[in-house]
Regions:
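C-terminal-of-GTPase-core extension/linker across diverse P-loop GTPases
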Residues: 2-217, 222-228
């Protein structure tokens, strides 16, 4: 605020806007509140991003509990009470969530093959690993989505923003894909797995061609057609 005061007094509109926001923000921070919870207009949010404040970043809590507590988070154990308290605080003060993981279990899972890991989790009464839950929660918080490409040699996942249309999603692979975009062949991951192969998915009518306005969905398996 002090740095821009002189420029603001000389009529610099950008400096005036930054000073005005700083004057609104400082008492909020002095009260021990994170910048994320300050109600701002769209233009103010844009300015705030330029301040690079840690407390303006999206927030997600991770609670580490013991192996025996993971399947009994509704109980009266000390760990369960702490988890509920963190979740309540996160919701009330930051409007965010909390993911529960067990570092002990994650360490054991890292040494197991996928099928054994799945059986191990089932025996604990949980469906997914803590790391998997943490990744999905972070993606949701940041507005990110994943689509897949597959071929004879490899299958790859690509990260895009929610709402990205097919050309923009193609550009994540290479700018030429976006520049010369023609169409995208789409099949959902679930349909592809259920059918067993791309050929059978085509026979079942699960493959379709989409154009430039198609919004790529989480879990889409995509083959781009382009020409440059």
């Amino acid at each position: 605020a002090e740095r821009n005061q002189k420029a603001a007094r000389s009529g610099d509109k950008e400096a005036k806007a930054e000073v005005a926001l700083a004057e609104k923000l400082i008492p909020h921070l002095d009260a021990g509140k994170p910048a994320l919870t300050l109600e701002l207009g769209d233009s103010e949010k844009e300015i705030l991003r330029g301040f690079f404040l840690l407390t303006s970043k999206p927030t997600l809590f991770a609670c580490n509990v013991g192996e025996n507590d993971l399947a009994n988070l509704e109980g009266d154990s000390t760990a369960a009470k702490h988890v509920r308290a963190v979740r309540q605080y996160a919701a009330d003060h930051l409007g965010c969530g909390a993911v529960v993981i067990s570092a002990q279990i994650e360490s054991e899972l890292a040494d197991l093959p996928p099928e054994e890991a799945k059986e191990f989790l089932a025996g604990l009464g949980v469906e997914d690993s803590g790391v998997g839950q943490l990744i999905r929660a972070a993606y949701h918080l940041l507005g990110l989505r994943t689509y897949l490409t597959t071929g004879p040699k490899e299958t790859r996942a690509w990260t895009i923003h929610a709402g990205d249309k097919a050309p923009a999603a193609a550009g994540v692979i290479h700018s030429d894909f976006e520049r010369g975009f023609i169409a995208a062949q789409i099949v959902s991951f679930e349909d592809l797995v259920a059918c067993g192969s791309e050929a059978k998915a085509r026979e079942a009518g699960k493959l379709r061609l989409e154009g430039k306005e198609y919004v790529v969905q989480d879990g889409d398996v995509v083959e781009f057609r382009f020409n440059v």
